Amino acid sequence: MQRLRGHATVARFRVILPAVHGNFGRILLVELDGDTVAARHIELPRSVYRDYIGGVGLGAYLLWHHAPAGVDPLAPAAPLIYSFSPLLGSPLTTTAKFALLCKSPLTGRICDGLSSSRFALAAKRLGVDAVVIRGALAQLSRLHLDEVPARCFVRPCPELAGLSARAVQEQLRSTGLATHVSAIGPAGEAQVRYATVSNDGRHAGRGGAGAVLGAKRVKAITVHGSAVAGVAEPAAVATRARELAARSEGIATDKYRRLGTASNLETFDRLKILPVRNFQSVSIGKLAARRLAPEGLTAAAGHTRESCAGCTIGCDHRYGGQRLEYETQFALGPLCGVEDPQRLLAAARACDELGLDTISAGGTLAFAMECSERGLVDWPLRFGDDLVPWLERIARREGPGDLLAGGTRAAAAVIGGGSAAFACHVKGLELPGYEPRAMQTMALGLCVASRGADHNRSGAYQADLRPGVDRYHVDPARAPAHVIETEDQAALLDSLILCKFLRGAIPEPWREGAELLSMVTGLAIHEADLRRAVRRIAELRHRYNLREGWTIAEDRLPDRFLDEPLADGARLVRAEMTAAVAAYHLARGRGPDGADLAESAP
């Protein structure tokens, strides 16, 4: 390995690679040390791609092998992994995405996020299937990655300190240093445990990947490469790309194109499943919901629509120039008692600029608001207050913001006074925008999710809205199968990688996923192969958490959902939830305590 100090200047040439399809068969291992960087390629066996596909699956495999057992998430030895997929770079819609993995500094468990961006396309042109970053630098720097490992370099960037990721990208573009950038904001620099990583403006890293990058003192990552993986059957892929694009513009995605997920808020309020004021109630009323719905936001701030890179759906709805989807809308709105559209949009903008996960930021502030109103803390913070000053305190760890930068679970441990009962998290990750007492299959999904309280790693909420499902009770005989079905489909899409908004346009995801992967890679891949791979991915995630200290006691919701019924009397029943969690692990081929594993170590 050749070490380059500072930012050595070298001539550039195009890398000539052997004919490969979809994957390059290797990763880039980047090791940071003081003011130097060493990078080298590591070849991967072909079996890894068949066993783990790519995206979050490949990333989980790499995390298992490159993260020392029990490592502190913010220690130099803890890796941050950018994992690509075999479909990335193809003409297939919604595939311009990558997975970002680490050990979460918020939960101490696996953290895997997804980001669409042109940075994803540029990064795969490094000629690798993943980038694994280990070590740490002595000062805040820009890390530049090149298709020739010896040409990777670091450059100190004190001028970028304290800037938002957007400002960093604009500055690097204006000086000609980069076109596509992965960067952190002030929250990442301060190692806030739910800081995100912004990739050409698209944030990833719920669970604190931005803090991991900040601990490595990497402000921004730029890339240069010209490698192309290609596809095995160009004509077939082009035909399927046109078909899939047409389906993506049909009825299955009409809601996302017209209104986006922000339209959920009004529906959830009507169904009484909208979390309000730290999950103390389930409705803000018809008029307030209408003000925060797309029509109200449009009237207050104007509306535009955009698309992610390489996407034909166009679900990116912006109000007053600010991107807004349901989870941000709920977390910075009703959850915190905020009903003013401008105040909501200002908080969303602040999270993007500071680099904060909106769900954890809103959940932590909602918890703090309740603590303040109960007299457990002496802070000038009440439901409905302006969130922006508090978000800035958190991002810079100023005053009470330093405590809140650790998330709800950590704050409750310090505040005490029974606050853990209403600290709304699972495994340390704040809850998404679904009321568990009124969506009890979803409640099970939140309990058992490997990342913590997570709506994206399963679609268990879909089961609660199916005909014939009693969403006010969890059935240990049926609910685990619903959760596993949606977990496995999510893992499939997240490993291929395809956007979940395509679910309705791909009625047979296992069959079509196998066809797409076969066309791209040239390998004979069947539906059964994908099902085996996804089961293997599920077990590896669980095995990783088990190695890092997980026990069955973590698969539960806070006491609020068990002891405090909703106005209609709905609550979770301990015996039912305990039985359902045990049944889930049994259905996964483990013991009822989750400790007897079905698969051998990878």
Where are these regions (language model features)?
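Compositionally biased, intrinsically disordered low-complexity segments enriched in Pro/Arg/Gln/His
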Residues: 2-5
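Extended C-terminal regions of large enzymes
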Residues: 173-207, 213-602
